UniProtKB/Swiss-Prot annotation:
Disruption phenotype: Deficient DNA double-strand break formation during meiotic recombination. This is Meiosis-specific protein MEI4. The gene is Mei4. One of its GO terms (cellular component) is lateral element. Part of the MCD recombinosome complex, at least composed of IHO1, REC114 and MEI4. Forms a complex with REC114; the interaction is required for MEI4 stability. Interacts (via N-terminal domain) with REC114 (via C-terminal domain). Interacts with IHO1. Expressed in adult testis and brain and in embryonic ovary. Keywords: Chromosome, DNA recombination, Meiosis. Required for DNA double-strand breaks (DSBs) formation in unsynapsed regions during meiotic recombination. Probably acts by forming a complex with IHO1 and REC114, which activates DSBs formation in unsynapsed regions, an essential step to ensure completion of synapsis. Residues 1-127 are annotated as: Interaction with REC114. GO terms for biological process: DNA recombination; homologous chromosome pairing at meiosis; meiotic DNA double-strand break formation; oogenesis; spermatogenesis. It comes from Mus musculus. PANTHER family: MEIOSIS-SPECIFIC PROTEIN MEI4. Belongs to the MEI4L family. InterPro entries: MEI4.
Length: 389
């Protein structure tokens, strides 16, 4: 007889007898068991909250320690090497993006920001302000507040790295190699919060979240950082990319275009990094190819198509156009990778699809044509650059 199952059965029997003997007279055994279970659940929830708070404190201490080690290494090389950090902090939830002030229905050219202008403005403001050391504790009243310390940490880290590189110092890499887990754990928590928010983004859209995505993009654009961090967080990063995509495609609210604009810009920001560029393009083209197949089948059978999905797919076209037209950060010499299966599939059936859908869906066919032109141009540019001596 196996001892483990026997001990388990004996323990269950002993627990049942103890509950029966200790239950109050005015309660049944079942009621008393449910009462005890609720007490245990409450205690577990309390202890879990305390554990999460302690883990957050430990991570914050690890962040301070890493920054202090890097700073002390810089100081040994001379006080003039140390960077001066400003006293500003990441944008709070009270400071929301100004584009959210309108209803999304204003058509005036004076009040309307074109996507290109929005993209240019965002790229120019992706370097968020830095905070003084040490990292400060903030009241944890909202989802944003616990992340403020991570944002401060990443901003300090990137600034210190910039100074070590400009000073030709190896202090940064020495300490980072020994404790890269601190950064990867911080990135993991930042991704968790971003995934939670973007699963159900609501208005007004806080600029904190766009700054968080911008910081993530800066980390991904740095070769030394991304080489250590994102191989540990690759699955979570992939989940975040898919969450952003679903936030666009599955949104069926009347005022969804405002939210889609900012979610789309987040994908453009991620797609500007050479490390994430391929996965973003692959993800978007996969969805476009799938919709093309569905639309072709509907057109052939004279069926009814999902109007909301049809409208939402145009955001994907805009994202792809923006990503394809800008040079990737972190590797300016990088070219388009035409080995992406989704890209090959798109280009192979490009002309046929346009011819077949141009009568029933002329606008959709026009955007397909534009996207095809960009992809073919990128391919020709890549071949040209590779053929040069």
């Amino acid at each position: 007889m196996d001892i483990q199952p026997w001990y388990l059965k004996t323990s269950k029997l002993a627990l049942a007898l103890a509950i029966i003997h200790s239950k109050p007279a005015d309660r049944s055994s079942r009621e008393y068991t449910e009462y005890l279970a609720s007490l245990v659940t409450q205690k577990e929830s309390t202890w879990k909250s305390k554990l999460e708070a302690l883990e957050a404190e430990v991570l914050q201490l690890r962040q301070k320690l890493l920054l202090s080690r890097i700073s002390s290494g810089l100081f040994k090389n001379g006080p003039d090497v140390l960077p001066t950090l400003s006293d500003q902090e990441p944008t709070s939830s009270e400071n929301t993006l100004t584009l959210m002030d309108d209803s999304g229905c204003v058509l005036s050219n004076e009040q309307r920001n074109e996507p290109a202008e929005l993209s240019q403005h965002f790229v120019e403001s992706t370097d968020p302000p830095l905070l003084p050391l040490p990292l400060e504790k903030r009241p944890r009243t909202t989802l944003e507040n616990p992340l403020s310390s991570h944002m401060q940490f990443f901003q300090h880290l990137l600034e210190l790295k910039k100074w070590t590189e400009s000073s030709s110092l190896k202090v940064y890499l020495t300490h980072f190699e020994k404790d890269s887990s601190t950064v990867s754990d911080s990135v993991s928590q930042l991704l968790d919060a971003l995934i939670t928010f973007y699963r159900n983004p609501k208005l007004p859209f806080s600029s904190f979240w766009t700054e968080a995505v911008g910081t993530l993009a800066r980390l991904a654009s740095d070769f030394n950082l991304s080489n250590h961090i994102f191989k540990r967080c690759s699955k979570k990063l992939e989940e975040f990319e898919k969450t952003l995509l679903q936030a666009i495609l599955e949104n069926n609210s009347i005022n969804r275009f405002q939210v889609q604009r900012y979610v789309s810009q987040s994908l453009v920001t991620l797609g500007s990094c050479s490390l994430l560029r391929k996965s973003i393009i692959s993800l978007l083209l996969s969805e476009v190819n799938s919709f093309v197949d569905d639309l072709g089948a509907i057109d052939q059978d004279q069926g009814i198509y999902d109007v909301t999905r049809y409208e939402n797919i145009f955001s994907l076209f805009w994202i792809l156009e923006q990503v394809l037209q800008q040079a990737p950060q972190g590797d300016r010499t990088a070219h388009m990778d035409h080995s992406i299966p989704e890209m090959q599939t798109f280009l192979q059936k490009h002309d046929e699809v346009i011819f077949r859908l141009s009568d029933a869906f002329p606008l959709f066919a026009f955007y397909l044509w534009r996207l095809g032109v960009l992809l073919n141009s990128a391919e020709m540019e890549t071949v040209k650059n590779e053929s040069l001596p």
